[in-house]
Amino acid sequence: MTVSMVDRPADKKEASPWPADIAAEFERESKHPNPCVGTTLLSENERTRVWIIRLASGERLGFHRHVLDYFWTAISGSRGRAHVQDGTTVEYTYQPNETRHGRLGKGEFTVHDLENIGDHEMVFVIVEFKDSANKPMALPSGVAPQ
């Protein structure tokens, strides 16, 4: 199944205040943008970056910034919660092999975190396209394909 990110409604969406630690982390990310959209960079070449997200039940990937066009595919089914830059908190149920695409125009970006609120390991593969409207952000030192 291929669905645009904006075409799939969340299972739950709230606009309530975030916990203080989450809000503080979001503020830090706004001052020091985090380009690491996965837990591990698997591959990088002149055209793409390929990431994996692997989160045990209860684990969380901190705030990160999408500036490139990308897609992700859920390898395992799970439930996730994300705090999104518009101040909302959303929850989704992910099915194995579910794929979604994100496209960002010049100067646009998306910031969010991701927490596995399911009972099983959450695994996604993310592919970013470097020939997008925005230039790729530099990766932190020490982040290299594994």
Each language-model region and where it sits:
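Glycine- and acidic-residue-biased ligand/ion/polar-headgroup-sensing regions
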Residues: 66-86
